[in-house]
Structures are given as C-alpha cells and as structure tokens.
Amino acid sequence: MQNINKFTEVYIFVPSITIRRKLPYMESRVKEIDYLKCIFITLMIIFHLVYIGDKYPYAKQIVYTFHMSAFLIISGYLANNRKDARSFLRKFLWIFIPYACMEAAYTVMSHFLPVRESVDAITPTVLLDKIFLHPMGPYWYLHTLILCSLIYYITFRYVRLSVVSRLVVTGVCLFALSHWGGLMNFSNALYFLIGMTVSQSGLRFTQVFRATTFAIVPFVILCCFPANLDRGTLAGVAITWLSISLLLVAYGYLPVQAKRLSFFIGRNTLVILLFSPIFTILSKAFLPVFAFDPTGMLFLVTP
C-alpha cells in the first residue's frame, strides 16, 4: 500500500498562542505494522507452549521482554481518538465482548484442566474479578488495551489542552489505574503511551522505528545480561525499540509470498490471540509423539 501524502490539519490551543500542526493521514493498513504484528503474535504462541518455553528459558526471557511491549506500542500508535462516541463504542464492544467471553471460558477451563494458572472455584465473583480486574492467560493484553484506549479516547476527545498536556493527563490517569487501582501494570501502559506519543507527533511509524542493522550490536549486548530482560526497565524499552528496528531490516529481505502471509496473519491477530490458549492446550497431545527430539523443533514446526 502506497503512502498517502494527504494531511489533516489540527489546531492545538495553548495559553497566548495557537500552534498549527500537520498530522499525516493514517493509512487503513500499514504493511510493515502488519508484518511486525505477525512476528510478535507468532513469538507469543511459540513461547506460550510450555514445552518450548522450558527447553529455552533464556530465549523465552528475551522474547518476553519485547514481544508484547512492541504490541502495545503498535496498539497505541494505531488507536483512533478521532471517531465519534458511537463509532468508538462500537469498536470498544467489538473487542470487549469477545475478550469477556474468552476470559470467562479460560477461567472455567483453568478450574478443570491442569494448567499453571489454576482457579480453585468458579463463582460469579471470580468470573467478574477475572474479566474486569485481574485477567488470566494472554488476555491481560486485551484488558490493558481496553483500559488504555478508553483513557486515551476520553482525554483526547474531551480535555481541551495542548497535545503535550493531554499526553501528560493520559499518563497520570494510566498511572492512577495501575498504582492505586491495581487494574494493570504501569510498565505495560507506558508502552501504549509511547505509541500514542509517536502517533501524536505526526511522524510515520517507520520514521521513528527505523530499520538499521546497527541495532544488532546493542541488542545482543543488552540481552547478554539477565538484569536487562525486564520490560519495566529502561533496558527493556531499549530492547523493544531495537527488536522492532531489527525486524524491519529483515522485512526488506523477505520474498513476496512470505510478506503476503505475514500481512494476512498480522491482520488477524485478534482472532489468533483469542483462541491461542485452545491451540496450546491441544498441542500437548502431540508431546509423546515428538519426545525423541531433544531440541523440540519438530514439535514446534509440525502442524
């Protein structure tokens, strides 16, 4: 999809001065972003397989440092605060209803099946707690996305301040929900805020996250120290940033068919995320078949 060179003019009012900014018109799909979403959702599924995660614990630590962080940056960048309330509510429910259904199903499943996150009893209170307050499994991402998107929309639609001031207000609200409300991890919300900031800057995603092979050196150095493998640290932010840059380098070398496949997967990450726990549970049935392979690679690549 070609870049669109149209611009939308917006005005930011600050005391005593009016600043006129131009924001690039957001394309409906950005190929590089779909590609990145494909890579990150694939990494999520791979390392949610307990068998693979246990065989490669350090690789799992590295991947867990950046894959969902990058997802949240992309989500913040793509979040649309220019919709009217009706359209926003429709989009909000389009995410919340599947999330609530799958989170409830996952909670019930965790009571009956031998999973790492187990639930002692299934009651309406437990279900409401998991859906609205303390989600289980991979659905914490959707829970965080819903809360961050809601705060972002309210702040940028109804607060009459400069863009910088509204970003600060959004950050304070997210911190309050995290620190005092206990509804999410602030380090996760911070990545969404980074994506918001990039979007509000008017720069294209690939202008901020540039493809560069030089990123490999600091990426490897940072990943050599276990203390850096925490997305809640500055090192974690750097690893996330560098991973995006490196993956964009690889994007330039992909054959056309591989790119098309990545675009398709990237456009359907919500469905994949929703049903990923079912896949990971069913895959356990094949463990005895591939027990002879000490690397676990046959188990990983066999459909």
Describe every region a protein language model picked out:
Residues N5-P303:
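Alpha-helical transmembrane segments and their immediate juxtamembrane cytosolic regions
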